[in-house]
Amino acid sequence: EYAVKLEEYVEKIKICGKERNSYSKTDHSATFMRIKTDYMGNDQLLPAYNVQVGVADEYIAVVDVNQYRSDMDCFIPLMNEFYTTYGFYPKYPVADAGYGSYNNYIFCEQHGMEKYMKFTMFKKETTDRKYREDPFRAVNFPIGEDGIMRCPNGKNFYLRYRKNVKGNKYGRQEEYYQCEDCSGCPYAEQCKKTDKNRIVRINRELTAMHQEVIENLESIQGALLRMNRSIQAEGTFGIIKNDRWYKRIVRRGIKSVLLEVFLVSIGHNLYKYHNKQKKVATAA
């Protein structure tokens, strides 16, 4: 009995693979995900695929279908697909906050791409002045000429250890600093949540990357690229889902699903091309 169960579990793990922790019984390539359209309203997980498209001049330039639930993990495969198709990487890959991660920023640096993907806290960093300038955030702690980081109360923070970040491809490490003495601190209630000396995590490289992203996206060019992305990328999905009523994949298996999405994308591009040619003819 145990041997039979063990074989069953081994087979399930083999189907699931290393990159995910679930699969559908009716389609082994599909992964259970939370989708935006929750008809039952009970936060139910449903078998799905993560469809990614790259849009340029209103045309779908590249398509990819993934089993990853997170958009962050889909960015690099999509860029590699773009390179395979066109022989170069896009100079300005603009994306929303779901794509900004250390792995993706390093990938951009290695392949000559500028960092124009928002990170998770981008909106809060750029719109919430109180949060951005909070003196009790570790990134705002001043560093003296002696290289020692100090809190608003003037206490020193010393490096305790470094820790590798789980699931990181490029050896990202976080530094853990601890305050020398928090006892009797007048800012204790504002600064920390425990009775122990405060410990903060710092990744200066990632913080610098976030600052670079903010500068890029807050520039005039960045604002135009962001606006263009929201119109073209979101607009493309809107047209396909709402105007064409393509809201559900009908094929099973990742290869068949990719073929289906390719066909839908070709149809979208032909429709766009026809409309543009029609406008040119009308204007002439």
Where are these regions (language model features)?
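Anion-binding and metal-coordination hotspots
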Residues: 1-284
